[in-house]
């Protein structure tokens, strides 16, 4: 283990620009072997690392809760770009190939731990193996895609995604829905002339479509508290921090919209008692029940890693959606009706208003 960890850190630290690692195995199998811990604290500030790896969809179909391993890793390693492939479409050859750096072939024990590995570092040999095993083959269809933007125009991904009437959102990067109209105006005033029309269009989408749709929200309590304290939202492609007064108005808008729209479900996932190892969530999930994407908290990306994972495979999207919906079965989950929220809000209003003023 220490050899693999040291090798990955050494090779990444000596590279500049873009680096690519091909992993010919199942992500969850390697998670259980502790492999993804080797990527902790990689020096990626001035460089980019893309990891291409397989996913055993049959295994995830049987137990969608295994996706927790994938989510926890993506949430922790925000500076790395992951692209997933159906394990059936790649050679499950226990190979690790870092472009222009090394080839490793390893063996796992019956208990799933690393037993041994062979190492090739000869430049010409590594290049030959990479050319023979790379993922450019058309039969290797990615299950996900990276994106730096969802598009703010009429023909962008965002427009198509929200042209639906039913949504599920697991929000970790502020609460970027049911926003007051004045917040859109503030964002528009701070935007470039090219963006202002797009912000106006986004406002119309939210107020006329999303606010009237059937929506299920799940929000971790740590993310909710962080939003109340700093007001940060990552709205499609725009970063913005609501003022304390705008946050107060936002709370009122959420409550009034829920009174008008009985099809909005609000659920909170308690993060109390999860231990010191819990560092919070910085990866949100958005679904319209047909397709979905995950969005990183841009504040915690330290390089040029893409902030969006688009889930392009319908089967994988169903698995991911089922995983996040399964969180409702946890004892830490609590769902609230509007009358309950109104009562709670009146009871803790002084605490909320003091929290809003924390700097």
Residue ranges and their predicted role:
Residues 318-359:
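Charge-biased C-terminal accessory regions appended to nucleic-acid-, cytoskeletal NTPase
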Residues 1-334:
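Hydrophobic protein-protein interaction segments
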């Amino acid at each position: 283990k220490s050899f693999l960890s040291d090798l990955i850190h050494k090779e990444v630290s000596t590279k500049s620009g873009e680096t690519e690692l091909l992993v010919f195995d199942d992500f969850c199998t390697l998670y259980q072997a502790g492999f993804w811990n080797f990527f902790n604290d990689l020096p990626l500030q001035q460089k980019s690392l893309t990891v291409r790896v397989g996913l055993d969809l049959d295994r995830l179909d049987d137990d969608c809760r295994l996706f927790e391993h994938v989510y926890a890793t993506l949430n922790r390693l925000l500076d790395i770009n992951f692209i997933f492939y159906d394990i059936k479409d790649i050679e499950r050859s226990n190979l690790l190939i870092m472009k222009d750096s090394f080839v490793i072939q390893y063996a796992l024990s019956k208990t799933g731990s690393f037993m041994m590995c062979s190492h090739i570092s000869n430049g010409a040999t590594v290049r030959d193996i990479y050319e023979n095993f790379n993922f450019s083959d058309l039969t290797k269809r990615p299950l996900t895609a990276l994106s730096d933007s969802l598009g703010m125009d009429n023909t962008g991904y965002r427009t198509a995604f929200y042209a639906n009437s039913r949504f599920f959102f697991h929000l970790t990067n502020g609460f970027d829905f049911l926003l007051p109209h004045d917040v859109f105006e503030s964002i528009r005033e701070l935007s470039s002339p090219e963006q202002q029309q797009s912000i106006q269009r986004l406002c119309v989408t939210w107020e006329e479509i999303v606010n009237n749709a059937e929506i299920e929200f799940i929000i971790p309590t740590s993310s909710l508290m962080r939003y109340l304290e700093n007001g940060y939202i990552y709205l499609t492609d725009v970063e913005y921090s609501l003022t304390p007064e705008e946050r107060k108005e936002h709370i009122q808008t959420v409550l009034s919209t829920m009174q008008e729209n009985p099809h909005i479900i609000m659920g909170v996932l308690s993060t109390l008692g999860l231990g010191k190892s819990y560092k919070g969530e910085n990866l949100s999930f958005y679904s319209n029940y047909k397709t979905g994407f995950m969005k990183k908290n841009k504040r915690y990306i330290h390089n040029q890693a893409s902030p969006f994972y688009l889930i392009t495979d319908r089967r994988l999207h169903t698995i991911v959606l089922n995983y996040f919906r399964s969180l409702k079965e946890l004892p830490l989950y609590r769902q609230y009706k509007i009358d309950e929220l109104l009562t709670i809000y009146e009871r803790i209003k002084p605490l909320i208003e003091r929290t809003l003023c924390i700097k």
